[in-house]
Protein backbone atom coordinates (compact mmCIF):
# COMPACT_ATOMS: atom_id res chain seq x y z
CA UNK A 1 0.00 0.00 0.00
CA UNK A 2 1.30 3.41 -0.86
CA UNK A 3 0.70 6.26 1.53
CA UNK A 4 0.53 9.42 -0.57
CA UNK A 5 0.14 12.11 2.08
CA UNK A 6 0.96 15.53 0.71
CA UNK A 7 0.12 17.15 4.02
CA UNK A 8 2.78 15.28 6.02
CA UNK A 9 5.79 15.18 3.72
CA UNK A 10 8.09 17.65 2.05
CA UNK A 11 7.44 18.24 -1.68
CA UNK A 12 10.74 16.58 -2.69
CA UNK A 13 10.22 13.47 -0.52
CA UNK A 14 8.74 10.34 -2.08
CA UNK A 15 5.56 8.87 -0.53
CA UNK A 16 6.18 6.65 2.49
CA UNK A 17 5.71 2.94 1.95
CA UNK A 18 3.41 0.83 4.08
CA UNK A 19 3.10 -2.96 4.31
CA UNK A 20 4.13 -4.60 1.08
CA UNK A 21 4.85 -1.16 -0.36
CA UNK A 22 4.82 -0.86 -4.09
CA UNK A 23 4.17 -4.55 -4.51
CA UNK A 24 0.40 -4.12 -4.22
CA UNK A 25 -0.12 -0.37 -4.71
CA UNK A 26 -2.08 0.67 -7.78
CA UNK A 27 -0.44 3.10 -10.15
CA UNK A 28 -2.29 6.32 -11.02
CA UNK A 29 -3.83 4.90 -14.22
CA UNK A 30 -4.95 1.70 -12.44
CA UNK A 31 -6.37 3.72 -9.57
CA UNK A 32 -8.26 6.05 -11.91
CA UNK A 33 -9.71 3.12 -13.87
CA UNK A 34 -10.69 1.34 -10.66
CA UNK A 35 -12.44 4.42 -9.25
CA UNK A 36 -14.22 5.02 -12.56
CA UNK A 37 -15.39 1.41 -12.72
CA UNK A 38 -16.81 0.94 -9.23
CA UNK A 39 -20.25 2.26 -8.29
CA UNK A 40 -20.48 2.58 -4.52
CA UNK A 41 -18.22 4.26 -1.99
CA UNK A 42 -18.36 3.94 1.78
CA UNK A 43 -18.21 7.40 3.30
CA UNK A 44 -17.10 7.82 6.92
CA UNK A 45 -17.90 10.99 8.83
CA UNK A 46 -17.75 11.82 12.52
CA UNK A 47 -20.90 12.81 14.38
CA UNK A 48 -21.11 14.02 17.96
CA UNK A 49 -21.95 10.42 18.89
CA UNK A 50 -19.04 8.89 17.00
CA UNK A 51 -18.29 7.49 13.54
CA UNK A 52 -21.02 7.41 10.90
CA UNK A 53 -20.57 5.19 7.81
CA UNK A 54 -22.84 5.24 4.76
CA UNK A 55 -22.78 3.98 1.16
CA UNK A 56 -22.92 6.65 -1.51
CA UNK A 57 -22.63 6.96 -5.27
CA UNK A 58 -19.74 9.04 -6.56
CA UNK A 59 -17.68 10.01 -9.59
CA UNK A 60 -13.93 10.51 -9.89
CA UNK A 61 -12.64 13.13 -12.33
CA UNK A 62 -8.95 12.24 -12.00
CA UNK A 63 -8.22 14.76 -9.24
CA UNK A 64 -11.35 14.93 -7.08
CA UNK A 65 -14.04 12.59 -5.81
CA UNK A 66 -17.50 14.08 -6.29
CA UNK A 67 -20.28 12.94 -3.96
CA UNK A 68 -23.94 13.89 -4.13
CA UNK A 69 -25.67 13.78 -0.76
CA UNK A 70 -29.14 14.43 0.62
CA UNK A 71 -28.82 17.74 2.44
CA UNK A 72 -31.11 16.64 5.30
CA UNK A 73 -28.98 13.55 6.06
CA UNK A 74 -26.84 12.82 9.09
CA UNK A 75 -23.83 12.71 6.75
CA UNK A 76 -24.52 16.29 5.58
CA UNK A 77 -24.92 17.52 9.16
CA UNK A 78 -21.67 15.79 10.14
CA UNK A 79 -19.75 17.32 7.24
CA UNK A 80 -21.18 20.79 7.83
CA UNK A 81 -19.76 20.63 11.36
CA UNK A 82 -16.50 18.82 10.49
CA UNK A 83 -15.54 18.48 6.80
CA UNK A 84 -13.01 15.69 7.40
CA UNK A 85 -13.93 12.46 5.66
CA UNK A 86 -12.57 9.04 4.80
CA UNK A 87 -13.92 7.31 1.71
CA UNK A 88 -13.38 3.67 0.79
CA UNK A 89 -14.03 2.12 -2.61
CA UNK A 90 -13.24 -1.59 -2.68
CA UNK A 91 -13.92 -4.79 -4.58
CA UNK A 92 -13.25 -8.50 -4.36
CA UNK A 93 -14.57 -11.45 -2.40
CA UNK A 94 -11.57 -13.73 -1.96
CA UNK A 95 -8.28 -12.59 -0.41
CA UNK A 96 -6.39 -12.97 -3.69
CA UNK A 97 -8.75 -10.57 -5.48
CA UNK A 98 -9.15 -7.80 -2.88
CA UNK A 99 -8.44 -4.29 -4.12
CA UNK A 100 -9.41 -0.83 -3.11
CA UNK A 101 -8.70 2.83 -2.70
CA UNK A 102 -9.03 4.90 0.47
CA UNK A 103 -9.22 8.68 0.08
CA UNK A 104 -8.94 11.07 3.04
CA UNK A 105 -9.31 14.79 3.27
CA UNK A 106 -11.83 17.57 3.68
CA UNK A 107 -14.93 17.99 1.55
CA UNK A 108 -16.19 21.28 0.29
CA UNK A 109 -19.74 22.11 -0.78
CA UNK A 110 -19.92 23.06 -4.45
CA UNK A 111 -22.92 24.76 -6.03
CA UNK A 112 -26.37 25.50 -4.73
CA UNK A 113 -27.82 23.72 -1.68
CA UNK A 114 -29.98 21.88 -2.47
CA UNK A 115 -29.18 21.47 -6.15
CA UNK A 116 -32.08 22.44 -8.42
CA UNK A 117 -30.15 22.53 -11.68
CA UNK A 118 -29.26 26.20 -12.07
CA UNK A 119 -26.32 26.49 -14.48
CA UNK A 120 -23.00 26.09 -12.68
CA UNK A 121 -19.90 25.58 -14.84
CA UNK A 122 -17.91 23.95 -12.02
CA UNK A 123 -20.55 21.19 -11.88
CA UNK A 124 -20.72 20.51 -15.63
CA UNK A 125 -18.10 17.74 -15.60
CA UNK A 126 -19.15 15.89 -12.41
CA UNK A 127 -22.80 16.00 -13.47
CA UNK A 128 -21.95 14.69 -16.95
CA UNK A 129 -19.89 11.87 -15.41
CA UNK A 130 -22.61 11.08 -12.86
CA UNK A 131 -25.38 10.99 -15.48
CA UNK A 132 -23.30 8.69 -17.68
CA UNK A 133 -22.34 6.36 -14.84
CA UNK A 134 -25.70 6.01 -13.10
CA UNK A 135 -28.41 7.16 -15.52
CA UNK A 136 -27.00 6.06 -18.88
CA UNK A 137 -27.15 9.56 -20.35
CA UNK A 138 -25.57 12.99 -20.45
CA UNK A 139 -28.11 14.93 -18.40
CA UNK A 140 -28.27 14.99 -14.61
CA UNK A 141 -31.76 15.14 -13.12
CA UNK A 142 -32.13 17.18 -9.93
CA UNK A 143 -34.63 16.43 -7.18
CA UNK A 144 -34.09 19.46 -4.95
CA UNK A 145 -32.91 17.24 -2.07
CA UNK A 146 -29.25 16.62 -2.98
CA UNK A 147 -26.16 18.82 -3.25
CA UNK A 148 -22.57 18.28 -4.34
CA UNK A 149 -19.52 17.65 -2.18
CA UNK A 150 -15.99 17.67 -3.63
CA UNK A 151 -13.12 15.80 -2.00
CA UNK A 152 -9.66 16.69 -3.27
CA UNK A 153 -7.78 13.96 -1.38
CA UNK A 154 -5.00 14.89 1.00
CA UNK A 155 -4.07 11.22 1.25
CA UNK A 156 -4.71 8.28 -1.07
CA UNK A 157 -3.92 4.67 -0.19
CA UNK A 158 -4.49 1.88 -2.72
CA UNK A 159 -4.00 -1.87 -2.87
CA UNK A 160 -4.55 -4.69 -5.30
CA UNK A 161 -3.88 -8.10 -3.76
CA UNK A 162 -4.13 -9.68 -7.22
CA UNK A 163 -0.54 -8.46 -7.69
CA UNK A 164 0.56 -10.94 -5.01
CA UNK A 165 -0.85 -13.85 -6.99
CA UNK A 166 0.24 -13.57 -10.62
CA UNK A 167 -1.69 -15.77 -13.00
CA UNK A 168 -0.16 -19.22 -13.19
CA UNK A 169 0.51 -20.59 -16.63
CA UNK A 170 -1.49 -23.71 -17.25
CA UNK A 171 -0.07 -26.64 -19.14
CA UNK A 172 -2.21 -28.93 -21.22
PLM features per residue range, with description:
Residues 48, 90-94, 135-136:
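Short beta-turn/strand-loop junction motif enriched in small, turn-promoting residues
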Amino acid sequence: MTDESAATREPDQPPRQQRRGRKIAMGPAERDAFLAGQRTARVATASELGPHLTPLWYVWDGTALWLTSIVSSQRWADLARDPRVAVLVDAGEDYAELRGVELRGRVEIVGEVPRTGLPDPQLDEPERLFAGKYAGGDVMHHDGRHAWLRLVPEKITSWDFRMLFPAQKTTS
